[in-house]
A protein has these predicted regions:
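Alpha-helical scaffolding within the catalytic cores
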Residues: 3-13
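Short beta-strand/loop motif that positions the catalytic acidic residue
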Residues: 15, 21-25
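Alpha/beta-hydrolase-fold catalytic nucleophile elbow
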Residues: 1-2, 23, 69
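Extracellular/periplasmic catalytic domains that process cell-envelope and extracellular macromolecules
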Residues: 13-16, 57-59
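Short, well-ordered loop/turn elements at secondary-structure boundaries
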Residues: 16-17, 132
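Acidic catalytic loop of the alpha/beta-hydrolase fold
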Residues: 6, 26-35
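Membrane-proximal bilayer-interacting regions
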Residues: 16, 34-38
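Alpha/beta-hydrolase-fold serine-hydrolase catalytic core, especially in secreted/extracellular enzymes
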Residues: 41, 45-230
Length: 230
């Protein structure tokens, strides 16, 4: 990327489990791109401190965000590919962070091994999943944004405060595979601290067909799923 974006439009949480490169000209002042990039850098640094490692002991927020001295909107993109090529995709992270939000009237229907069957409200929803052994812990919250800084000329929303409250009334499908849990043993699932499932999860052809139709991803054809209401 070469220009900052208000974080309400691109929550940094959704960039966990990947390498993220973001270079912007230090003098790229159009639409406050340089300022917004500095806010993005601060957010990634904060998330890295709050979540240094995933449940499977992997760095969660690997990022390189810099303002390039003396540059405006035109920058040299050549350093990006050598930096990114050191990372490999992990389709089965044991920690997932996801802020589900409206994008021009549409929502994603799923993220990694989660599929939303019913949203808890019209608000944004934050999902945090951690898998330790055969215990899956889900934290699901409603997210409310409050704008704390606006540009005085165009009214661009620049900076935000996020308030979280426990979400209720939703339904989520949790897909599982051997890379995430031991399917030969019982699985325990908690949502917002409450046990919602305990027992063995049965593999089925239906799960494979359903996940294939949902994700269109050969790495995410899951043998089992559980539907969970909260």
């Amino acid at each position: 990327m070469a220009g900052g974006e208000p974080l309400k439009n691109a929550p940094a949480d959704n960039c966990a489990n990947m390498g993220f490169s973001f270079l912007t000209g230090a003098d790229d002042m159009g639409f406050y791109r340089n300022v917004l990039t500095s806010y993005t850098q601060a957010m990634f640094d904060s998330l890295q401190l709050a979540h240094p490692l995933s449940a499977d002991k992997q760095p969660l927020f690997r990022h390189r965000i810099n303002l390039v001295p003396g540059k405006q909107h035109h920058i040299d993109y050549r350093p990006t590919t050598p930096w990114l090529k050191q990372f490999s995709r992990n389709p089965y992270p044991k920690t997932v962070l996801w802020e589900d939000f409206d994008m021009d009237g549409r929502h994603r229907s799923g993220f990694y091994n989660l599929q939303v069957l019913a949203r808890p409200s019209d608000n944004r929803t934050n999902y945090e999943m951690n898998i330790n052994g055969n215990h899956v812990d889900l934290r699901i919250s409603d997210v409310k944004y409050t704008t704390v800084q606006k540009d005085p000329q165009w009214g661009i929303e620049m900076k935000f405060y996020r308030d979280y409250s426990e979400a209720t009334g939703g339904k989520v499908r949790l897909y599982l595979c051997e890379q995430l849990v031991d399917l030969s043993k019982p699985v325990e699932i908690t949502i917002n601290g409450k046990k919602v499932f305990s027992g063995k999860v049965k593999a089925s052809l239906q799960s494979m067909v359903s996940s294939c139709a949902e994700y269109f991803d050969p790495c995410r054809v899951y043998p089992a799923y559980i539907d969970l209401a909260y």
